[in-house]
């Protein structure tokens, strides 16, 4: 029977069919090659938006810098970055007037956080620009290298383990006349491979010391590396994102802590909450506007879009905001928080890998690194690239472009939200002093604006006033891309509202399926995703049951573990059939061992091992979960593990799932190729840091009570904690006298070893 697809939607309101229009099936687009062009676009655009600002030269680095603050007032609708300081400060003052004590309280909370945050906070995060090697590294390695180089230069305050002390070292490093760094260099040599007896090129990385003068060091400390943002759906062009180095990261973290604390207290802020909590917050604002717009008033909502939010924001404006927010606070606190915006107003954007050239007959390929772009003959480039390079040349210093205005993606999401909310706050009747008033929602650069007025003229006047207020603060609402509707239908951060939020199920599509971690985790994640979508995203029972069957099928094909009584032949079927035949209780076999699927939509919350435990043969239980079985994963498995799932918008989010250690929770080994290179040392460092941090976490689980604060080293802290815990356990009868004595002996041994060292 042919189905006319339009019939499917006859009974469905258009908004509920929104899912079908989203570009979320199939693989997302990835970028290939270098991000140099995209970065140049960003730098050039940012300068263009602020072109009528004042040019100055940075006395330390010699970089030309453009300052658009308090620039000309706009004469047309083109996007500009000319924020007016007095307007921003006034918006902050009104925000404080509407929320008495908000800044004061947030400052106190932040001071407490600053006292307690440890350096290992900076090991969280993916790629980080490592200024010692001039390339990206995992966060833990980049931090380790930075601390190692600081120590080499006599900066050792950070050894206390507190983040604030590490930041003191950073400040001090910027005053030094020269910094000695340890950097890597590559040597290639031909050697004979033992296994294959062929000649291979072996690359070794040596470490060498190098001196940087003050200018060279400052340039590196202020550099943000750039990459192309991958996997962005629904866009034709790629765009560049930035990774800051370790010097900037800690300062940004504290500013964002303060801003987060403020956002939590603002009802119009879509950050830092997410999911259902966010929906509830939004629904409240809408409800308020609809109840107040009785029969006498009209209420309209704008689904807003801002033009190039990041490129028109300005770090100098953020400095003004912070100066105001912290105005009655201690000097040290104000200083710590003002460093991040100051560093950002002097930032340099690294242009990435440069350009790849190929000769016509494809015989020759050559890479033109970014450092060469300032001097190379431009006749080799096509027109558009030539224009980009010509424009950016005056800004180039050692392969990085001076970029004073603009914020780069994702650096101050919370603080820029505070700025946006301060405009929404000005819409109250007592401030507009006319018949119209507004309110709305702000989440980073995304906003929804609800305007109420007695008639259409009033609505128009309200929107115009909002638009102009935004302009004064360096925010450019796009008239082309924003649209207005009667209140009750709008979109905000990909949530679609129609008298309540409509589930946008397509968003979750990418996270369905087999994750590819291991058999145990994949089963657990798969059913958890289905469970979560039944709770949060209107996934109905019938569809969920179907999703479950599809998932099990997908899982069996991925791991070649079809049921023991199936006819399908795979590499594993021989072993699986053998197991099937010798198992008495076949229902007890895990799906990954060829067993039947016992999941249905009622028991998705139970880990498979627990679900089938009572049904298993005794010897199968013994093999599956025996800690002495060498195939049972010994990676300390927490009772709850975190998986990274890819929702369609926003960063990859972590999702908790239950983990039971069995023979199926294996951890794949690292690729051999890295172990044969000189990177091996880096890898070992990284694993060591990982182990130390994990060990420390074990001693001080964040849930128990506050992390140790003070000057003791990590080892001392762990030893003293071990002693306290042992005594408590001994006195409460949880451990025997011999165990207690042994723990005390081990602690003393550790202390002796430390003294000898």
Swiss-Prot record:
Keyword Nucleotidyltransferase applies: yes
Keywords: Eukaryotic host gene expression shutoff by virus, Eukaryotic host transcription shutoff by virus, Host cytoplasm, Host gene expression shutoff by virus, Host nucleus, Host-virus interaction, Inhibition of host RNA polymerase II by virus, Nucleotide-binding, Nucleotidyltransferase, Phosphoprotein, RNA-directed RNA polymerase, Transferase, Viral RNA replication, Viral transcription
Disulfide bond sites: none
Chief location of this protein within or outside the cell: host cell
Entry's Gene Ontology cellular component terms: host cell cytoplasm; host cell nucleus
Protein name as annotated: RNA-directed RNA polymerase catalytic subunit
Residue ranges annotated as motif Nuclear localization signal: 187-195, 203-216
General function of this protein: RNA-dependent RNA polymerase which is responsible for replication and transcription of virus RNA segments. The transcription of viral mRNAs occurs by a unique mechanism called cap-snatching. 5' methylated caps of cellular mRNAs are cleaved after 10-13 nucleotides by PA. In turn, these short capped RNAs are used as primers by PB1 for transcription of viral mRNAs. During virus replication, PB1 initiates RNA synthesis and copy vRNA into complementary RNA (cRNA) which in turn serves as a template for the production of more vRNAs.
Region (Promoter-binding site): 249-256
Compartments it resides in: Host nucleus; Host cytoplasm
Pfam families attached to this UniProt entry: Flu_PB1
InterPro entries: RNA-dir_pol_NSvirus, RNA_pol_PB1_influenza
Enzyme Commission number, as recorded: 2.7.7.48
GO molecular function: nucleotide binding; RNA binding; RNA-directed RNA polymerase activity
Family: Belongs to the influenza viruses polymerase PB1 family.
Organism per entry: Influenza A virus (strain A/Swine/Ontario/2/1981 H1N1)
Post-translational modification, as annotated: Phosphorylated by host PRKCA.
GO BP of this protein: DNA-templated transcription; symbiont-mediated suppression of host gene expression; symbiont-mediated suppression of host mRNA transcription via inhibition of RNA polymerase II activity; viral RNA genome replication; viral transcription
Catalytic activity: RNA(n) + a ribonucleoside 5'-triphosphate = RNA(n+1) + diphosphate
Quaternary structure note: Influenza RNA polymerase is composed of three subunits: PB1, PB2 and PA. Interacts (via N-terminus) with PA (via C-terminus). Interacts (via C-terminus) with PB2 (via N-terminus); this interaction is essential for transcription initiation. Interacts (via C-terminus) with human PKP2 (via N-terminus); the interaction competitively inhibits the interaction between the RNA polymerase subunits PB1 and PB2.
Name of the gene encoding the protein in the UniProt record: PB1
All copies of domain RdRp catalytic, residue ranges: 286-483
């Amino acid at each position: 029977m042919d189905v006319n697809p339009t019939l499917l939607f006859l009974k469905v309101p258009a908004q509920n069919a929104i899912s079908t229009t989203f570009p979320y099936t199939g693989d997302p687009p990835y970028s290939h090659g270098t991000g140099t062009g995209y970065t140049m676009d960003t730098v050039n655009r940012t300068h263009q938006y602020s072109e009528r600002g004042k040019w100055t030269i940075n006395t330390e680095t010699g970089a030309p810098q453009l300052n658009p603050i308090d620039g000309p007032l706009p004469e047309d609708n083109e996007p500009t970055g000319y924020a007016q300081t007095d307007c921003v400060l006034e918006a902050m003052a009104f925000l404080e007037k509407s929320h008495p004590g908000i800044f004061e309280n947030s400052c106190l909370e932040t001071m407490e956080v600053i006292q307690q945050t440890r350096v290992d906070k900076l090991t969280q995060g993916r790629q980080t620009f490592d200024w010692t090697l001039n390339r990206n590294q995992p966060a833990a390695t980049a931090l380790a290298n930075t601390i190692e180089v600081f120590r080499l230069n006599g900066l050792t305050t950070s050894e206390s383990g507190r983040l604030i002390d590490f930041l003191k070292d950073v400040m001090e490093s910027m005053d030094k006349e020269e910094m000695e760094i340890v950097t890597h260099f590559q040597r290639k040599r031909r050697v004979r491979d033992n296994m294959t007896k062929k000649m291979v090129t072996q690359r070794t990385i040596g470490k060498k010391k190098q001196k940087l003068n003050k200018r060279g060091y400052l340039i590196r400390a202020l550099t943000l590396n750039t990459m192309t943002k991958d996997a962005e759906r629904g866009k034709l062009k790629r765009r560049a994102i930035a990774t800051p180095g370790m010097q900037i990261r800690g300062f940004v973290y504290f500013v964002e802590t303060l801003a987060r604390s403020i956002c939590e207290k603002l009802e119009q802020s879509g950050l830092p909450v997410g999911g259902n909590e966010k929906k509830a917050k939004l629904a409240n604002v809408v409800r308020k506007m609809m109840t107040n717009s009785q029969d006498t008033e009209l209420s309209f909502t704008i689904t807003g879009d801002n033009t190039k939010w990041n490129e028109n924001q300005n770090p100098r404006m953020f400095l003004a905001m912070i100066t105001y927010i912290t105005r009655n606070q201690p000097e040290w606190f104000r200083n710590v928080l003002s460093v991040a915006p100051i560093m950002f107003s002097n930032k340099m954007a690294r242009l990435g890998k440069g350009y790849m050239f190929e000769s016509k007959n494809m015989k020759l390929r050559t890479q033109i690194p970014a450092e060469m772009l300032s001097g190379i003959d431009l006749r080799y480039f096509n027109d558009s690239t030539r224009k980009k390079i010509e424009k950016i040349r005056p800004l180039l210093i050692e392969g990085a472009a001076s970029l004073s205005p603009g914020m780069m993606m994702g650096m101050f999401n919370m603080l820029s939200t505070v700025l946006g909310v301060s405009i929404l706050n000005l819409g109250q009747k007592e401030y507009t002093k006319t018949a119209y008033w507004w309110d709305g929602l702000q989440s980073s650069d995304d906003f929804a604006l609800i305007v109420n007025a007695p008639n259409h003229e009033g609505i128009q006047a309200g929107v115009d006033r909002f638009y102009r207020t935004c302009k004064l603060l360096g925010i450019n609402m796009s008239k082309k891309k924003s649209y207005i509707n009667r209140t009750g239908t709008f979109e905000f951060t990909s949530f679609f509202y129609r008298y309540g939020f409509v589930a946008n199920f397509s968003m979750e599509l990418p996270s369905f399926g087999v994750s590819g971690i291991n058999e145990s985790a994949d089963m657990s994640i798969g059913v958890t995703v289905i469970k979560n979508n039944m709770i949060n995203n209107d996934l109905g029972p019938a569809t969920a049951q179907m999703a479950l069957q599809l998932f099990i099928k997908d899982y069996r094909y991925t791991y070649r573990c079809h049921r023991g009584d199936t006819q399908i032949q795979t590499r594993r079927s021989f072993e699986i059939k053998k197991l099937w035949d010798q198992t008495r209780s076949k229902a007890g076999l895990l799906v990954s061992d060829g067993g039947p699927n016992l999941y249905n939509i009622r028991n998705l919350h139970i880990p498979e091992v627990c679900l089938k435990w009572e049904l298993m043969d005794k010897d199968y239980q013994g093999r599956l979960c025996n800690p002495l079985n060498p195939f049972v994963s010994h990676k300390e498995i927490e009772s709850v593990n975190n998986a990274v799932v890819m929702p369609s918008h926003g960063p990859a989010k972590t999702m908790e799932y239950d983990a039971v250690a069995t023979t199926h929770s294996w951890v794949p080994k690292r690729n051999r190729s890295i172990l044969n290179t000189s990177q091996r040392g880096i890898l070992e460092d990284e694993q060591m840091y990982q182990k130390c941090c994990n060990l420390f976490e074990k001693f001080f689980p964040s849930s128990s009570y506050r992390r140790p604060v003070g000057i003791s080293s990590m080892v001392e802290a762990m030893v003293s904690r071990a002693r306290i815990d042992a005594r408590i356990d001994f006195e409460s009868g949880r451990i025997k006298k011999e165990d207690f004595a042994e723990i005390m002996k081990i602690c003393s041994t550790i202390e002796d070893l430390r003294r000898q060292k």
